[in-house]
Design a protein with these regions (language model features):
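Proteins enriched for Cys/Gly/acidic motifs involved in redox and nucleic-acid/cofactor modification
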Residues: 19-21, 112, 126-154
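Charged/polar positions on well-ordered alpha helices
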Residues: 12, 16, 43, 53-57, ...
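Zn2+-dependent cytidine deaminase-like catalytic core
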Residues: 31-130, 215, 246-251, 307
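A short, flexible N-terminal coil/short beta segment enriched in small residues
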Residues: 10-14, 29, 34-41, 130-143, ...
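Enzymes that bind and transform nitrogen-containing heteroaromatic metabolites
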Residues: 3-8, 13-17, 22-24, 80, ...
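Short, conserved alpha-helical segments within structured domains
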Residues: 25-27, 127-130, 298
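Short beta-strand scaffold segments in enzyme catalytic cores
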Residues: 26-35, 153-154, 361
Length: 378
């Protein structure tokens, strides 16, 4: 096997931790000696052993003189687990091949430096682009302390997310809907608007046994959420946050908040100067709550607000081979729109694939001020 194949194996191992490691990154490690893999591992869950230590624990023979391929710079600080640099040094590994650089200020090059000072050969930025793709959420959250927001919607070939009556079940087929369940498991939070709650009464949970459900966030400026909605009734089972604007703190609003709290719902007031929810303030609050990523499953109004607020980093669009037609049928992004094509929000397509009979397109959002590639481009 080649160096590239060993690192590719480490990348595949890292992906096994998807949905479980947050807010930690996904990391894989492979230990090679005399052209043979003698140990491998990945970070399975936040709070548990890191990839390097799991790889060492799986060793079939001494790692003295071996090379370890790791997708992210080894940590060098004490947290919930001891430093991985210590374990690598103790095993007398002679070479460390690193993919991504760790943006965590507690590491940020210090891990590689400690290894070099111990006489270990360190190769950095090996297959960095491929390794960076594992952890856009981690890189964003560790540097901004705000969630990485992914906007997801399903639409027909003529760009409709619902019929003129508001009906939307189901636009895509079962394979695409199963992928959405996987996405809900992958991200720490899921966010929808009050319009979606009133129209569909969704649970916004994961319906696959053994997968974790995200924290549910509802944007509801005027606190219209029904106390008998599925989301409120299940709030003691799944953490639920309702964000409101607090335009008028009257007795009725106060009573509604108290009743929501009694049912297990958390509330947060994030008003802007227009009496709507300030999504940037909400992201700061959610980041402080330890929520590193959000799957935005909003309607056209919330999607428009999120894009205008600049909080969306990725767009995942599922397109079904159907036509709804109708000027009153709902679209993924509402609002007043733009006047000229040159004013469009620029996206960079990173993946297109077929899922059953449907097509999924993934794009990164480019910064408006930027010329050339997206800031998030890996």
């Amino acid at each position: 096997m080649t160096d590239q194949e060993y690192m590719f194996r480490a990348i595949q191992l890292a992906k096994k931790g998807e949905g479980w490691t947050n807010p930690n990154p996904m990391v894989g490690a492979v230990i090679v000696k005399d052209g043979r893999i003698i140990g491998e591992g990945y970070h399975k869950k936040c709070g548990e052993l890191h990839a390097e230590r799991n790889a060492i624990a799986s060793l079939t023979e001494s790692a003295e003189g071996a090379t370890i391929y790791v997708t992210l710079e080894p940590c060098c600080h004490y947290g919930k687990t001891p430093p991985c640099t210590e374990a690598i040094i103790e095993q007398k590994i002679k070479k460390v091949v690193i993919g991504s650089r760790d943006s965590n200020p507690k590491v940020a090059g210090k891990g590689a430096q400690i290894l070099r000072e111990s006489g270990i050969t360190v190769v950095q930025d090996f297959m960095r682009e491929e390794c960076d793709r594992l952890n856009p959420v981690f890189f964003h959250y560790i540097t901004t302390k705000t969630p990485y927001v992914v906007m997801k919607y399903a639409m027909t070939l003529d760009g409709k997310i619902a019929t003129k009556t508001g009906a939307s079940k189901w636009i895509t087929g079962e394979p695409a809907r199963q992928e959405v369940q996987h996405m809900r498991h992958r991200y720490m939070g899921i966010m929808a608007g009050i319009g979606t709650v009133l129209a569909d009464d969704p649970m916004l949970n994961v319906r696959v046994e053994g997968w974790k459900s995200p924290v549910r966030i509802v944007c509801d400026s005027s606190l219209r959420i029904p106390l008998d909605s599925q989301i409120v009734r299940s709030a003691k089972e799944y953490r639920t946050i309702v964000a409101y604007a607090g335009r008028e703190e009257n007795e009725e609003i106060t009573e509604k908040i108290e009743r929501l709290h009694a049912k297990g719902v958390d509330t947060v007031c994030c008003p802007d100067e227009k009496g709507q929810i300030d999504l940037k303030k909400l992201m700061t609050y959610l980041g402080n709550e330890g929520i590193d990523s959000i799957l935005l499953e909003g309607g056209g109004t919330l999607n428009d607000s999120a894009l205008r607020a600049g909080i969306v980093k990725e767009v995942h669009c599922f397109i079904a081979p159907k036509l709804f037609g109708g000027k009153n049928s709902k679209t993924p992004v509402q609002g007043i729109g733009i006047g000229l094509p040159s004013e469009a929000l620029k996206l960079k397509c990173t993946d297109i694939c077929r899922i059953g009979e449907d097509i999924r397109i993934i794009c990164q959002v480019c910064e408006k001020e930027q010329e050339g590639p997206c800031l998030q481009e890996s």
